[in-house]
Amino acid sequence: MGKQKREIEYDCVARGMVRYLHIPARKARLLTNMIKGMTVREALNTLAVTPRPSAVPAIKRLLLSVVASVDRKAHPNTDDLIISKVYVDGGPMLRRIQAHAMGRAFRIRRRSCHVTLEIGE
């Protein structure tokens, strides 16, 4: 494994969370690790050209929601704010049954996740 990135502490300006997102945590982490530490403008541009269509709309909606909740008087230019922290936690699994050969049944686990995003300066 590579070296752990050292996180820089930013003052939290706004925080948002989406729960029970019907995307596996592993797929969501690929995107969130990519945009962590970027400015809001860079993150939106990166999400626009990312070839991972399953998680992009949900992460983009969350990012725009957090940007909308920023106090405009204290921070008039929201494009320069930095994504300071992003967590993706596993959510509950929906278990489904798929019929298989010789009367067997296989389990299908439909995974979900919770995503938390913080914007700082």
Stretches found by the model and what they are:
Residues 2-23, 29-30, 34, 38-121:
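Structured, basic alpha/beta domains of bacterial-type, RNA-associated proteins
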